[in-house]
Amino acid sequence: MVNQNKNNNLLYGIDDKPPMVETVVLGLQHYLTMFGSTLAIPLILSKPLGLEDKPVELGWLIATMFFVSGITTLLQTTWGNRLPIVQGGTFSFLAPTIAICGMAALNNVGWEVRMQHVQGAIIAGSVFEIGIGVTGLVGKLLRFVGPITIAPTIALIGLALFKFGAPMAGTHWPIGGLTIILIILFSQYLKSWYRSIELYPILLAILTAWAVAAIFTILGVFTESHPSFTSMENLKNAPWFRVPYPLQWGIPQFGIAAFVGMLAGYIASIVESIGDYYACARLSGAEIPNERTINRGITFEGIGCFIAGIFGTGNGTTSYSENIGAIGLTRVGSRRVVQAGAIIMILLGTVSKFGALFTTIPSPIVGGMYCAMFGMITAVGLSNLQFVDL
């Protein structure tokens, strides 16, 4: 095993335990980093599911996503691969989910019935993923996977994700670009000024850009139709508390066609997660993942997908690349910090008002943050080439 902690110049390594206040704030930063992707998934699925005119139910679905993400992140970091890796919804499941919702048999049914069929496919697929992990089939393939394979995989994950970040930032480049510039300034050039800047570059960049957008909204520069317009309407309309619970949308429905379609999403998720494990281990100073670590990670991702199916998130769970990028920018690879972030996800998943507050972050800011995150992921992937003996 090779421990990479000495080479990373980390502020906190994987087993380090920062002070309580720092742990909570850094955990909140992880929550904010994964917020955009997690929020985007139910918003994208709202039309196929039939929730576009049901803001209350859509809010419940969003809260369920965060609640389940917190549970699965705790499971993965405590008993799974034990890397400081955040678990959350995956874009790999979007295409098969949309296809399931579009089946002719579901054309004239309520959104709950569509959700039940999606849940059934996700639960069935999770059994497949758990089996792959428990039997060690994924780990056995690792003997054929080296740095020259991992490097382009991780780099392509980062590059592929730009299609989600760049268009969002591009809706208003002044604010999106400001977010990117602030993240670069805080993480690379101003980090020696104050320790808080060094620890929270992403959070500070989001808050600063958000404040700028809010000021221009108040001054009337950004009107309601403007991409950077900041409105508190969602916050006013949201209820205070609601605790998600299993089978809240009804009993899952199982079908062969839906299961087979969802398998494609699972395979893509597994391949992406293996690359994420290597990137996360490298950035957090952990040992290079071995066959056992990979098997446990995939097993617990399958368990996470099973939980997501039972609760009805309309999606599965996988490793979040953007949070791995956050580790690189903050140089904080502590497992405890990610676990704190998971607890925050669970708690705030029951507080509808808090989640509604962050829906007021303009999309250009979220897109700008993604561009910086995905750039870091791409760089980490290419850095694996240093281990290739040419």
Describe each model-derived feature in a short phrase.
Residues 20, 46-79, 260-335:
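Membrane-embedded helical hairpins/re-entrant loop segments and their flanking transmembrane helices
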Residues 1-25, 221-247, 283-286:
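Intrinsically disordered, low-complexity non-transmembrane regions of multi-pass membrane transporters
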